[in-house]
Amino acid sequence: QLGLQDPPHMVADLSKKQGPWVEEEEAAYGWMDF
């Protein structure tokens, strides 16, 4: 899960991901876990 240390572009990217693909994206971002 992404934390508060994420760059602004990531935060903005997550804010527009409000569909069924969000879980899939979270899994893809799992390796970048802070």
Curated annotation (Swiss-Prot):
Gene: GAST
Lineage: Eukaryota, Metazoa, Chordata, Craniata, Vertebrata
Compartments where located: Secreted
The keyword Translocase is annotated on this UniProt entry: no
Keywords: Amidation, Cleavage on pair of basic residues, Hormone, Pyrrolidone carboxylic acid, Secreted, Sulfation
Entry-linked InterPro entries: GAST, Gastrin/cholecystokinin_CS
Phenylalanine amide modifications at: F34
Primary subcellular site in the record, as a coarse category: secreted
Superkingdom per UniProt: Eukaryota
Chain positions found as Sulfotyrosine: Y29
Similarity remark: Belongs to the gastrin/cholecystokinin family.
GO BP term, example: response to food
Organism, as annotated: Capra hircus
Name recorded for this polypeptide: Gastrin
Transmembrane segments: none
Gene Ontology MF annotations: hormone activity
